[in-house]
Amino acid sequence: MKKIFIIEDEILIQQSLKKLFERRGYSVDVSASGKTAIDMILVNEYDRIICDLMLQDISGFDVIEESKKKFSPEDISKIFVIMTAYNSPQVLSRANSYQCRLLNKPFEDLDEAMRLMTE
């Protein structure tokens, strides 16, 4: 069973994604805090980490930077999916520097979003 970690401070989105993944057979951990998420990432193994960019305590980019203590840049590009409602040129440029998948919120096509988060 694949293990997914969702880092999202909007509880409705967090819980909706958790239920969708669990229905598809995934094991799912969640966190609303970027700082707590970092601690969890460093001690757990995840097949995919889906991280909102704008968290209440730190940014999703901060989570990725701290994850470099465990993962190589190549691993980060394969494991992380960044979710954001902000797609400014600066955000896109920084996301591209990590070579992570970028998923815009709100999701226009839920099936497509789920595919991008799991492939």
Regions found by a protein language model. Name each.
Residues 8:
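Conserved acidic carboxylate
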Residues 11-29:
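Two-component/phosphorelay signaling modules centered on CheY-like receiver
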Residues 30-48:
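Acidic, metal-coordinating helix/loop segments flanking the phosphotransfer/catalytic sites
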Residues 33, 59-65:
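Acidic catalytic/metal-coordinating carboxylates
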Residues 52:
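Active-site residues of response regulator receiver
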Residues 56:
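The feature encodes the CheY-like receiver
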Residues 62, 86-104:
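Alpha4 helix (beta4-alpha4-beta5 surface) of REC/receiver domains from two-component response regulators
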